[in-house]
Amino acid sequence: MTSAHEATPKAALYANVGADLTRYDVDVANAELIKRDTVTLPAGVQYAWPHASRRYLYVASSSSASGYGRAGTEHHVTAFAIDPATGALRQHGAPIPLPTRPIHISSDIPSENLLVAFNNPSGVRVYRINKDFSPGEEVAQPGPIDAGIFAHQVRVTPDNRLAILVTRGNEGTPTKAEDPGALKVFEYTNGVLANVVSIAPDGGKDFGPRHLDFHPTMPWMYVSIETQNKMVMYRMEPGRIEPGIAFRSDTLAEPGNIRARQAAGAVHVHPNGRFVYGANRAEATVEYQGKKVFKGGENSIVVYAIDQETGEQTPIQHIETQKIHPRTFHIHPSGRLMVAQHNLPVNVRDGDAVRTVAAGLSVFRIDDDGKLAFARTYDVDVGDKRMFWMGMVPLPA
């Protein structure tokens, strides 16, 4: 942890409502966010990723609805220069068009290329980052890409040798069989992808991975299994992911009390490598007094302690986020603060009455033992739009 005698690293927080991306200052000591200014994208923000230099932010946007909803026609990556003192954003170059809705964007380790995941149809493409840091042309791939079903995230391993496409598949319904999920692993060489292996236990049955993160110093990868509400750990070797699950844990506080659809979400490892965090999401509604109200379930952050010898994750806390559906969350680079973002306003029962829980941001302090202490919420009026992404970017020292 950062001691009181060390300077707290500065970071800017960015959160969207539809196509608008707003910057907030982050006051770690007081666990406060201060709203500043807003830039507007060509369409709704889907995800964003900073350049390794921390001086540019690449934002994926789309006019498509989420999931398998209405398909739009506007899909782009837009670059912004980050003011190193304040975090203010200034558009840098022209947006580049994409073929369909980008669900996730990241860069390789040196930020020479952008990797973009698409959910419908499932896919991954690589785009050069130009010498002037603007997004550039697509990298031609030598052969077909095995992109699975419903890609949700793409990441390059810390050694820059593999790219991993997290493909969730789809849960089964009374009228449609389950679509299998998988981790699609590719050799990665300067933007060129080559199929290596599909990690899909039992053929991907009951395996719906959504999001992963890497330990900062050890060869350990943590993956949330959205459709089974699990957190799993994989061991890594140079240029290889061991295909067997090393450790598996529940994400829910009450895995035997599923009140409505639960979905494990984002995963982030603490900067000190001692803890890993995951999101639990629920938003299903039922009719009550002529209104749709929250059916119940866990909207929480689960905290795991990481065994520093084995990498095994052990749950030590579940804490409610105070709002509904924490789609994204992020840890401040100081390791002392977490912020969670929530998509939409939802009606909830309050005794015999009904009240609305607004979309917005929840702020938590992170204690030395890794546990979270709730600090405050910020309501955000999303109108007919939604919050979809939030993240913090360290500013250059």
Q: Language-model features: where?
A:
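Short loop/turn segments immediately following beta-strands, especially the blade-tip
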Residues: 24-31, 79-87, 126-136, 185-193, ...
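Short, solvent-exposed loop/turn segments at conserved positions within beta-propeller repeat blades
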Residues: 15-17, 66-75, 117-122, 172-181, ...
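Residue-level detector of Asp-centered blade-edge/turn motifs that repeat once per structural unit
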Residues: 7-9, 51-54, 107-111, 158-160, ...
